[in-house]
Amino acid sequence: MDAVDAVLARMRADQGLARDRAVDADVDEAVAASPAALAREHASMRALAGTFREETEDALGRRWYAHFERWLCARRDATRDGDAIPSAKRRDARDGGLARSLAKAGRTTGEMATTTRRLARAAAKARANASARASDGRKNRVRARRIEVGGNGKRAEKVELTCGKVTLELNLRHYETLKTRWRGDARRDEDGFHRAVFCVVARYATLQGTHYKAGNMQAAIPPRVFETLEKRFDVRCELFASPLNAHFKEFCSASAMTDRAFGSLGNAFDFEPSEGSFECNPPFDEEIISRLAGHVERLLSRAKKPLSFFVVVPLWHDSRGWMRLAKSVYCVSNTTLEAKEHAFVSGAQHSRIDQLTPSAAPTSVLFLQNKAGEKKWPVTPEGVAAIREAFAPPKKEAERVEKWDPDATSWSCSRRLPKDANSWVYKNKKRDQSVDESPAKTKKKKSAGGGLAASFFRD
């Protein structure tokens, strides 16, 4: 075991996580997530998304879901686990980003206040519905089956998981990866494994707003970048990841309740390493980036042993978080990746056929190190060049997906037709959908039962 492995072993011990895959005492019903509860949370978020769309689509346009995901991230308290549905406060300072977008679209102050009140009421209702307790333990049953999806020359195997009326999908490759991460034995307890997987997929779909195009807040850097970081800077742990997109075995994530069973070290802001080399790619939210800057600086100021952080954030010159990172006394390298010259892996990679997303906006990649870290892992021009090359977008058009641009309108994806259907619109409008539904141009309408029609969530 080398020095870095020893550090990671100590970190896992501090978090109460054994290195083997045996089910530990802490992974019990006291902390285990309930599939029925996560299904209710998912359904409640879909209802909130419907209200957001009704209130804002005329102003924000077809990509309202991107604004919804950012609004959720801004309102959500990043330090609290279990709060996927945001605060129900009528007025919240964190609504500023949404207000600016609405004002830019021509909304008046009074109209924005009305929108805020309606969203607050919808959030309160969603939180109440999500917290309702299931009376029947059978509601936690999860059904799993393999399916094949795709078209236009692109096909992929997926696993479909259903709990109650909520059906979600993930790629077979990610399903198999979760088997290796799970702390139980998937062969001996397949039902338990499927419950755990459903909880993870449902939680992250809810965090993203349940829309099939969402996921920008969970995007990851390309695998080649991780390989370069590990080879040149001994990076073996991610501070902002999930069981669905983590490259390394060691990672922190936003939802310990669902993720600890797959090896998560917990919330990044509760994680306090005293040595080691780490990757930080937080959600592109100004408040989270600002908090990360303070967290990293505090850790570096206290560390006596080598400590290094590779940070990926948007190039927001005027934001408090970016300025604090770029002007920090610990910042030893700050490189700009221009738009279209780098790519990210989709935040919904676990359910999409296409993976890489060329960026339509510039990004900053920074190294923050203490003196010991700077000496142990020097950042050289050759190292920076290798990182830049690893970030390069794919050259083959077939590997591309939509550009990372909130104002873009183009999108392409392959998807199977629903059973017994001859078009992309379901005949049964009450059928529940996953976060990966296909687009169809339909108008907003109500189903016969009074709820939002399935086509409501398609553009």
Segments and roles (model prediction):
Residues 1-280, 284-459:
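Class I S-adenosyl-L-methionine
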